[in-house]
Swiss-Prot record:
Alphabetized NCBIfam families for the sequence: PRK13676.1-1
Family (UniProt): Belongs to the UPF0342 family.
Highest taxon of source: Bacteria
A Pfam family hit: Com_YlbF
Organism from which the protein derives: Streptococcus sanguinis (strain SK36)
Record-given protein name: UPF0342 protein SSA_1465
Database matches in InterPro entries: Com_YlbF, YheA/YmcA-like_dom_sf
Amino acid sequence: MSNIYDLANELSRNLRELPEYKAVAESKKAVDADSEAKAIFTDYLAFQQELQQLAQTGQVPTQEVQDKMTSFGEKIQGNAVLSEFFNKQQQLSIYLADIERIIFDPVQDLLK
C-alpha cells in the first residue's frame, strides 16, 4: 500500500498540472504586472485577514466593514485583470471542493 503522504504529494503535483490551476497562475502574473490590480489585491488580502479575525472572535461585521466589502467587490468587478483572476480561481475551486469532499468522505462515514 502506498504511503498516504506520497499520495498527498502526488495529488499536489497533479493539481499543479490542471489547466485551471495553470490559468490561475497565469492570471496571477497578470495581476502582479498591473500596478492598480496588484494594489487592490494586496489591500483585499489585508481586508480578508481582518474579516477572519472578526469571525474568529465571533464579532459581527459593522456597517463600516460591510461598506468596505461592497467597495472591494466593486473595485474587483471594475478591474478586468482582477475580475479575470477571481473568475479563474472560482473555476479551480470547483475541483478543490470535489477533492475535499472525496478526502473527507471516510471521516463523514465515521460520524454516521
